[in-house]
Amino acid sequence: MMKIITSYIYRKGMKQIMHKKLVFLFIGRTASGKSSLARYICETLGLRQVKSITTRLPRKDEITGYEDHYFVSESKFDEIKFKEGFVAYTEINGIKYGTTYNEIVNSDIYVIDPNGAKYLKEHCKDEFKFIEIYFSSPFELAKDRFLKRDGSEEEFYSRYNSEDEQFTKYEEAEGYDHLFVNDMSFSKAAEALCDLLKSEMEKEKSL
């Protein structure tokens, strides 16, 4: 059984930002397409994605320079945690993940789970304006995507089941700003998502 320990540490003494930084939160189950689309959107629109710090090793499909994480040793992770603090910290099966405040300040898109998004919206609302986009895909399509990236059915079901409780609650609450049903080709999904983000950024400029 997958063991998940989640806690959040908000660094004290942070200066309040007068104009709220706009950050898009990409949330979705395993293989919903959120991470691939986030990378494409960043390249296309010139945006930057939050990269969390982790003690796990890179996967074989994580291309150098395009990873969603900074891979560090246990000692380096603890050093960063002590010196900078983490806005969010999660431990999954003994593997640690953390995100610093400055990383979010300097980024535009954050691929995050529902619990992390809830915490950020509750504790960082004075510094950031978060727009929450929930990526939903049909079960069989998500499984097919997962298998095409060299994952196994066993691994897919394990991940899907381990995240089911928090996502079921999240889906029932419907607290997101946009529901993005990703049941289309990558190119069509990318085009639709680009239009959505550009629209939101234009609204922000007009304020």
Across the structure, where does each feature detected by a protein language model lie?
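Conserved phosphate-donor/acceptor-positioning beta-strand/loop module used by diverse small-molecule
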Residues: 109-113, 127-147
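Hydrophobic anchor at the beta1->P-loop junction of P-loop NTPases
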Residues: 26
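Small-molecule kinase domains that catalyze NTP-dependent phosphoryl transfer to phosphate-bearing small molecules
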Residues: 151-195, 207
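ATP-binding Walker
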Residues: 32
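Walker A/P-loop
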Residues: 35
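P-loop (Walker A) phosphate-binding loop of NTP-binding proteins
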Residues: 29
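ATP-dependent small-molecule kinase phosphotransfer cores
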Residues: 54-116
